[in-house]
Amino acid sequence: MFTSAIRLSSQRLFASQPSVTAAALRSTATTLPLRSYSQPASLQDSSILTWSDFFKLRKQQRRINVGSSLFTALLGCNVSWAYLSTMEIDPTQMLFGFDPLTVISAGIIASGALGYLLGPIVGSQVFKLSHNQQLAQFNNKNKEFLKHIINNRVDASSQSFSNPVPDYYGEKIGSLKEYKQWLRDCHAYAKKAKEFL
């Protein structure tokens, strides 16, 4: 009795669905987008790094580097202050031919500057650790972007006060809109340089 009820409900289910012909299957199969079955659709779509995502990551990398530079500069100043504050200095004696307070201040400033210069090393490691999955694609896009910059930048030998070079290394480019504006600026620079020759 139970199996006959299952058969009856399955017959009703299949009877309510329209019959599918081979021609209908062929026509729908050609219009459906294909993807590999090795990854789900959400993983495949998110693994491709677009140019806008690249510029966002590039801006984030720059911010991380500046932040780490400020952090390491403060760290360098604090470490040098901790060392120099424990030294016994005779205020009547000169150090390197200068007043001791001047030498201590210069040492603190120099260690802060050294810390600031070492900051991007720390920042790049933080960026690599935080974006490990996209790092290979980011590096490939960065190489491709730098090739575009090298191919499209202008000759800086004909610059003047009235015709400055537009961002020779492309460091200020942070979006596709800014890249297009940079291309327009390069074209205007080249046109103006030809007119004045």
Curated annotation (Swiss-Prot):
Residues 1-14 form a transit peptide. It is found in: Mitochondrion inner membrane. It holds the Pfam family Pam17. GO terms for cellular component: mitochondrial inner membrane; mitochondrion; PAM complex, Tim23 associated import motor; TIM23 mitochondrial import inner membrane translocase complex. Its main location: mitochondrion. Keywords: Membrane, Mitochondrion, Mitochondrion inner membrane, Protein transport, Transit peptide, Translocation, Transmembrane, Transmembrane helix, Transport. The chain crosses the membrane at residues 64-84, 103-123. InterPro entries: Pam17 (IPR013875). Present with 3000 molecules/cell in log phase SD medium. PANTHER family: PRESEQUENCE TRANSLOCATED-ASSOCIATED MOTOR SUBUNIT PAM17, MITOCHONDRIAL. Component of the PAM complex, at least composed of mtHsp70, MGE1, TIM44, PAM16, PAM17 and PAM18/TIM14. Belongs to the PAM17 family. This is Presequence translocated-associated motor subunit PAM17, mitochondrial. It comes from Saccharomyces cerevisiae (strain ATCC 204508 / S288c). The gene is PAM17.
